[in-house]
């Protein structure tokens, strides 16, 4: 193979450089304008497809799909699109198909966006652990989200307001070795420990 300067390009004469003025090269580098609607948009993943119904002001015979990423949306706050939302956009041809460059509402206004929001991972994790509100004891929220006024402090073990967990009589009645273990394990421990004790003779 020769060096880059010695290679010939298709359609060029020897010693002549290909010009970038060809209609094909110009068409690929220039952004194209289109309009249509949002076909679908995944708010959790942040991408979707637009259904282009007009290109450069001329109506198309059949809609054409154009990829859209949330980073290309012209709007404030959480960026997403609502299914069926009217949009105008600039786009380019890529190796994967058509991709949007900038997406706006009709006339260049902000996009409306979807009302849906992805569920927070931290919210899902803390709910699955069975955490509860320290104020009212409810399972569906935490104290900072509690709608009730501050409640009197109470024992986390027996829920009494007369003492705290450190002075709980119900917790003190449990043997120190079995605290925090379910009853099933305590029974097994008792069975094993009595079987291991040697018999005393009198």
Swiss-Prot record:
Transmembrane segments: none annotated. Residues 107-130 are annotated as: Flexible linker. CDD domains: CSP_CDS. Residues 1-31, 169-202 are annotated as: Disordered. It is found in: Cytoplasm; Rough endoplasmic reticulum; Cytoplasm, P-body; Cytoplasm, Stress granule. Monomer. This is Protein lin-28 homolog A. It comes from Gallus gallus (Chicken). The gene is LIN28A.
